[in-house]
């Protein structure tokens, strides 16, 4: 099951496709409300376990329709989930050259330092412990915006990875 969220009166930018991988309904609701409250018009898709995340990203099973389920530009990933853990999903994504460029943000209730180190070691772009208030979550999203638009150096070439980077650089 997926939810897609958009806002017509949001600030003008090119929306990106974000995949939230989360099994806790309350955390899903908090994220949806934070996007709504912040008038973030990116497309947010939600899957509820690790295997479903890999199916979504690779376009397998019910996610074969790429118009309806596009490859995500950013993944928000919980660690503790059914079927496959967030670590297993992260390792699988980073081991596959088709998906290793997708930034993965660990958004999890674990504040364990070992999990932080393990996440970065497996290729996470960021680690955000929950609970995150709406305001704090919006600051995080704003921080990504600053990173992609101001700090990140983009390649001069025009290949698929540059186009993806250019798309990412324009979000929020």
Residues of each region from the PLM?
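Receiver (REC) domain active-site loop signature in two-component systems and cognate sites
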Residues: 79-81
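Short, glycine/charged-rich "phosphate-handling" switch motifs in NTP-dependent
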Residues: 125
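Residue-level signal for the "D+5" position in two-component response regulator receiver
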Residues: 46, 83-84
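A Lys-centered signature of the CheY-like receiver
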Residues: 130
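Non-catalytic signal-transmission and effector/linker regions of two-component phosphorelay proteins
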Residues: 1-19, 25-45, 51-54, 58, ...
